[in-house]
């Protein structure tokens, strides 16, 4: 099982739990990796030293929203069940990070121990193609 979690700027889950507590509470022999999903490059950078000490392969799926830590969907999407909500691309923006810059960032994280690599919101095929060359 590869476990995916979302982290906030404070290196905790949105529920306020610490990652180490989650690992201690739920890890079992079927865990083969831990992925930090839909997090900004800044959050990955800020938390990477902590995760390099894990005794478990880890990595990330970076989002390229224009802001570091999006607020919960409910704060910008007030649509009712029969309405169209706010487009997250408009509400959150998108950063202009080239595939080469994404590669450099990902390479730094690999050097810190990340082994599971990927992209999430606003990453494009060219970003993934570029990091696919990492060994």
Where are the regions a protein language model picked out?
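Domain-level signal for soluble alpha/beta catalytic cores
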Residues: 1-135
